[in-house]
Amino acid sequence: EEIYDTFCDTRNIGWSKLHDYASFLEDQNDYTKAIEVAENLRWYYSVPDSKVDEYYLGRLYNLLGMLYKAQNKPDKAEKYYLTAIEICEHLVEKNADAYEPALATSYNNAGVFYKEQGQSGKAEKYYLAAIEIMKRLVKKNADAFEPALAASYNNAGAFYYKQGQSDKAEKYYLAAIEIRKRLVEKNADAYESDLAMSYNNAGVFYKKQGQSDKAEKYYLDAIEIRERLVEKNADAYEPDLAGSYNNAGIFYHEHGQLEKAEKYYLAAIEIYERLVEKNADAYEPNLTAVYNNAGTFYYGQNKPDKAEKYYLAAIEIQKRLVEKNADAYEPYLAMSYSAAGVFYDNQGKPKKAEKYYLAAIEIYERLVKKNVDAHEPALATSYYNAGSFYSEHGQSDKAEEYYLDAIGIYERLVEKNADAYEPALATSYLRYYFLKKDKTYLDKVYEIAKRRQDDPRCRYIVEIVEFM
């Protein structure tokens, strides 16, 4: 009764403002408070005499879907996303011109959700449905809908990139860039940030494709824009700039340009540490990612003290984050444990290495029970790492167990997406062959590796097998 009265009192200022307030809280990464406001608003909308328009109800369900996704509560997020779609589809039947934009937004949000949940079939379905609507809307009013079409193209590019479908990924990334460059010519202030994001994504894509010249160009284009934007509004754009610096650090690290790599890693750390002082909840996850990258960098430079410092700093933060929200941050803690395991293994500290390897596996096994599609690839990698560890330390029974666990997962994953997982399966087969000397696995290795000469791991395996 008290809540109902409160909302009746606020009706004079408009419930749309409460929706805007919840959206504002989402932008501030204050998801708990945003959910509280949005759920109260949902309760108000359910009151029989609220007379709320279906359109606003659909908007609210979309927002709740995004909020619960951010809190890593996929069941609730999916429920709200699908309800929003159902409402918007119903509205489109009444008035397509008025409500197709809202339906496209709902489809796009569902695509993002299912991509993150590892449900690629559903993700693709919704991404393409959103694009189909947006392309139709652009023909009617390019100025109004090209920005949204570019966003949908960008999301589709990210989806196909993750699926290992490089031709489609490139097509959509470049389509997004083409639109956004045109938009920047009309209104740089409004669209340069979006163009920088597309440049950054293209850099990541071309790095993965081994096209280093293109990757570097796009990374530096993104940095150039973001540094300019930071001069105008540091609070708004420093987080994006830090992300670009981190990506450039990874790129130059992988290409052996160590001074540049260190420069960009440390620049990213400097920004994120400053941002964490202002808003720890929002930026500590990003800081831990760069700490891990810096740890790997210094490990490669044979500076174990610095490497250990950054690895442990990442773990310390992530353990604290897990205490606040295990669902959201346990995957990242598991990644840090895995990295620490590799570090201590190579430092000749097997007890610490084993501790971190097994801690990573424990988390991933728990995560897989909640969401197989999202976490099985990481679990397979952890099993493989443990197999290699026990093999190197003469514990062949444990090594065999973990290698077979990894192989079992990779064989399942290959059935779903051969392009993405065949190289990892071939590598696992090879390590198992070295352990057991079972020629059946050597034949399997060679069959995959010979066919997958597009992947450097497979090219290396072919050289090894043919040399043998």
Question: Where in this protein do the model-derived segments appear?
Answer:
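Periodic short-repeat tracts
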Residues: 106, 112, 120, 124, ...
